[in-house]
Design a protein with these regions (language model features):
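Nucleotide-sugar donor-binding/catalytic module of glycosyltransferases
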Residues: 1-124
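C-terminal subregions of glycosyltransferases and related glycan-biosynthesis enzymes
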Residues: 83, 89-90, 97, 101-168
Length: 168
């Protein structure tokens, strides 16, 4: 199970109260595999502008670190059942059309990574859904076509030919 710092929710709620335009607030995190802790593998993008730029490249939020406004969740239509493994990523993208987001600089959550987890067991399906959502983000947020197409094609090649997943 994932676990949070005792002050995580308080700090995130204070941030949301301080900035009424925020609809989504995450935090940095650590990963725990077995008994080994490591830094987060996802690049940390803290500002709304950086988060928007990253959405068509990767999901900058770890679900366990996120709080959001219920009103915005409802306005965005909640979780989309078309996605089994990327519901959160899709929701974050839709919520960004309704307000701003941030990721707090401090590591306020530890995520347990396990080979038994649904995410680990269904990596291929999760990557495919991520690719679909990244394409949606690319169209919605209008980032650089060349850069985004490179990453979209790289992800697609990695899905079709898994042994090439780590090419640069």
């Amino acid at each position: 199970d994932d676990y949070s710092s005792p002050t995580r929710l308080q700090r995130q709620v204070e941030t949301m109260n301080k900035y009424p335009g925020l609809v989504l607030c995450g935090s940095r995190f650590r990963e725990l595999t077995g008994n080994k802790e490591s830094e987060q593998r996802v690049p940390c993008t803290e500002t709304d502008q950086a988060i928007r730029k990253s959405m068509s490249l990767f999901n900058p939020f770890a679900h366990s670190t996120v709080i959001f406004r219920k009103k915005t969740f409802n306005e965005a239509g909640g979780y989309n059942n078309k996605f089994k493994y990327g519901q959160d990523y899709d929701l974050w993208l839709r919520m960004l059309s309704l307000g701003e987001a941030c990721i707090l600089k401090d590591e306020l959550c530890t995520l347990r990574v396990s080979e038994q987890s649904s995410s680990y067991q269904n990596k291929r399906a999760q990557k495919l859904e991520g690719l679909i959502i990244r394409w949606k983000a690319f169209r919605q947020l209008g980032e650089s076509p060349a850069k985004n197409l490179y990453y979209l094609l790289k992800s697609l090649v990695g899905l079709v030919f898994p042994s090439t997943r780590n090419f640069k």
